[in-house]
């Protein structure tokens, strides 16, 4: 085998730490903003004109999907893609630039939320969203070079899901900026949610789920051909969903039931990931990330609420409860679990010795149960508890889960470097026979 120059991509391993720290800090601020929006002063959203409510929902939604969750995913990408594709077409200054744009954009939006004034929020969020959009646009050329440098053998377990996530980044950035520049245009509001959350983030989430169970743990979920077909069908379902949303917005389709199309790609990735095989391994005692397993399990409930919301809930701000569940119950849990697993790989902790993140999983369970109750309450089927109290409990549960992640990351990543290695254990142990001439894969820890 041809030897790969160590200098070509060796330095990129372990480059995720700065972005993880940015995420850990800003998600605490986000939880405060979430409480301020939905629990402290619910009239700010519920009793506001539809357009103003849309702006507030868009602001609180931009923070995770382009801010602190995106920081974690970009950090994972900076660490893993050079290992997967044996190429690092970027330098350390880019990582610092991404971190600065990310935290700067989030701070501007959070300050706008805390002002409780729609004019201030709009102007500050436009500036913040521009910074957040710019960070992913900058990754476009790098993503293309990584895509062009790959070989057919690279990343076969994730394949198009990872490639598609990379190549979609500039599109996500452009749509984000346009959605805030044209924030009074309902078409771009719909475009933001359908493309970025329902499409892009669902794709990223499945890439991480597949990377964990099939690539990292070696559980056989699907072959390369099945992988390609699954991706093609997913893209088709997302496109159909986007078209139906726009036809409903234009009035060409008046039946709100078409909004249930959001559940189609969610159900698809749930069943195509073979939950029977996942749970067969879990019940057999095989270890995995409890957070990623929990996120995968919540896909089914999220899809069910999507159908329920389309049928029973009349609201003008989109599939609010479904997307809330998708962001926090599925996307955030998957990204948290992937982040923890990657960091523990860098600490060379054996899988059987890793701690379960039960506090986070339980808090997300409480939050998701609260969202489901609020959806059923809005649909007129459950009226047992005061919805404002339930909303407060859900936000507090999310705050505790975010705090748990923050405490873990600070204590483990900032103050404890005793067992940290630049090369994660997964890569130091894989393919030893085929890469013995490559200095990048040592046979001993560094």
Region roles according to the model:
Residues 1-446:
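Hydrophobic alpha-helical transmembrane segments of multi-pass integral membrane proteins
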